[in-house]
């Protein structure tokens, strides 16, 4: 899945990089001491071919978004969850809708946890989904038709959640 690091992956139909990097050059590119930014080099290795060497983003010292698989997984979850819960925009902004939305997202994330995308021995260690009055919304949100959802996912370490928030505009009361 997208949560697997795209490092050490061979490139098809590539003869060799225009610039050959050795370990010393790679060390200079790997992590800039000041910014934490890394360059994921394309390197040629004898007997292995041409490989993507690294899986870091340019987020540098940001512990949450440092790795490509984390960003790719969050992008996938955000898009999937927004699309799969879009039906809710035609529903009343009430507890019944929130329970259905939470249930759908929890089922989806449970499947991703079983596939190995999330860290943790239990689903409680791997993710949480919040949606409701006094939790992610106040009375004004409900009157204005905003359903706010908060999802915490442990992609790198159990119970260390990175938060994803999104809203849908639902029917107003």
List each model region and its residues.
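Structured, hydrophobic secondary-structure cores that serve as assembly/anchoring elements
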Residues: 1-173
